């Protein structure tokens, strides 16, 4: 089978699935990314880098400009995909990130392919003031509509997610060998001046994160806070604050994978203004390193992380006192650290969950083929 991957980076979050498909010699695989180190390679995979937007007239971050830029990048990618087709590479299956400009016209290039997209979590409130976030959400809606299968990788077991139009939810695969604690016993250490990670996915949540950090610092004077935001716009906002941030709050520059892993290994706790602000990769990779999540939200939505899962849950108004209390109890925190690591090893270990992802994709494509041929999908 010919398989085309399309993602922001190479290989990014699709790396475990890519490696699993590449290990099966019957597949011919091409990976198209917007960014990626050209010297990096995966055996059995051909990698191409899609050109960035060439327009110099599209300046700004407003919704209109962001949408124009997305359409232009989608058209440029369409040209690249048509050249692939002319070269003889016509994929049987396309796997791509959903909120991706380069996937906007994937159906125009490969109308006969089975298309599966990996959806992001639904955005937080605040899209009215976040042009890039709004366009990303619109791109995701478009991609979900034109896909034959929608998959959401989450800190949950396998379910069908009715909140995202019947998307299939699968456990996010974590490389537990790489994301592992520094301590031999698997628990993170808790010393004076404990490091606390405050992390959010979207730029719209940065200001809430700042308020949380300042409130925690007022109660725990000796803790060290590190602020992380996954979106480029959010990182830019934090960088602009720079020296104006209170002492004790650190904002790292863009991190390499090793630097990111090492940061997780030195943290005692990870938190966010609300549980929904955290992405599954950051949450689970932190837990795999023995970092204890202290989260505000409804724990019933995260059953694997609830009873005995290594997390502390509370109401939004209790978040700062709960964080302060956790940091004052190193013995209890060490127990939770071990439990957090065990939860990831039990439910999200890459070697255990990826076979299920492969099986689902093969089953979904087989059902799709039967439907295309006029048969039944049962």
Residue ranges of predicted features:
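Acidic donor-binding loop of glycosyltransferase active sites
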Residues: 148, 265-278, 291
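Acidic anion/phosphate-binding donor-loop and adjacent secondary structure
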Residues: 174-192
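Carbohydrate-associated surface elements
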Residues: 156, 173
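A short, well-ordered alpha-helix in the C-terminal region of glycosyltransferases
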Residues: 332-347, 353-359
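Membrane-proximal helix-turn-helix segments that form the acceptor-binding/catalytic region
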Residues: 129-150, 157-158
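Conserved donor-binding/catalytic core segment of Leloir-type glycosyltransferases
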Residues: 188-205, 210-213, 217, 226
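Nucleotide-activated donor-binding/catalytic signature segment of Leloir-type glycosyltransferases, i.e.
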Residues: 229, 235-261
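Short hydrophobic beta-strand element within catalytic cores of glycosyltransferases
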Residues: 292-296
């Amino acid at each position: 089978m010919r398989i085309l991957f399309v993602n922001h980076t190479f290989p990014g979050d699709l790396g475990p699935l890519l490696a699993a498909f590449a290990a099966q010699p019957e597949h011919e695989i091409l990976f198209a990314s917007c960014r990626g180190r050209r010297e990096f390679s995966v055996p059995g995979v051909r990698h191409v880098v899609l050109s960035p937007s060439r327009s110099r007239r599209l300046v700004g971050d407003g919704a209109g400009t962001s949408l124009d830029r997305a359409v232009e990048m989608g058209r440029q990618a369409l040209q690249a995909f048509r050249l692939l087709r002319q070269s003889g590479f016509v994929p049987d299956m396309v796997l791509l990130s959903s909120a991706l400009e380069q996937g906007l016209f994937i159906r125009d290039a490969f109308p006969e392919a089975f298309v599966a997209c990996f959806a992001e979590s639904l955005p937080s409130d605040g899209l009215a003031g976040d042009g890039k976030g709004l366009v990303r959400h619109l791109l995701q809606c478009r991609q979900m509509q034109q896909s034959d299968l929608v998959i959401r990788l989450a800190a949950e077991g396998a379910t069908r997610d009715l909140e995202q139009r019947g998307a299939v939810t699968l456990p996010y695969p974590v490389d537990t060998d790489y994301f592992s604690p520094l301590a031999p016993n698997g628990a993170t250490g808790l010393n004076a001046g404990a490091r606390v990670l405050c992390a959010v996915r979207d730029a719209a949540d940065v200001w809430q994160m700042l308020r949380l950090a300042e409130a925690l610092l007022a109660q725990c004077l000796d803790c060290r806070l590190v602020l992380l935001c996954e979106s480029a716009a959010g990182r830019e906002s934090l960088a602009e604050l720079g020296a104006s941030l209170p002492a004790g709050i650190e904002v790292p520059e863009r991190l390499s994978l090793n630097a990111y892993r090492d940061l997780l290994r030195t943290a005692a706790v990870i938190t966010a203004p609300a549980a929904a602000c955290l992405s599954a990769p950051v949450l689970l990779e932190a837990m795999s390193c023995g970092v204890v999540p202290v989260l505000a939200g409804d724990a019933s939505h995260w059953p694997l992380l609830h009873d005995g899962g290594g997390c502390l849950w509370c109401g939004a108004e209790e978040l700062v006192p709960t964080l302060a209390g956790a940091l004052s109890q190193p013995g209890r925190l060490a127990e939770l650290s071990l439990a957090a690591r065990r939860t990831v090893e039990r439910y999200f270990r890459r070697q255990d969950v990826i076979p299920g992802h492969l099986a689902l994709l093969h089953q979904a494509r087989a059902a799709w083929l039967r439907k295309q041929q006029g048969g039944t999908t049962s």
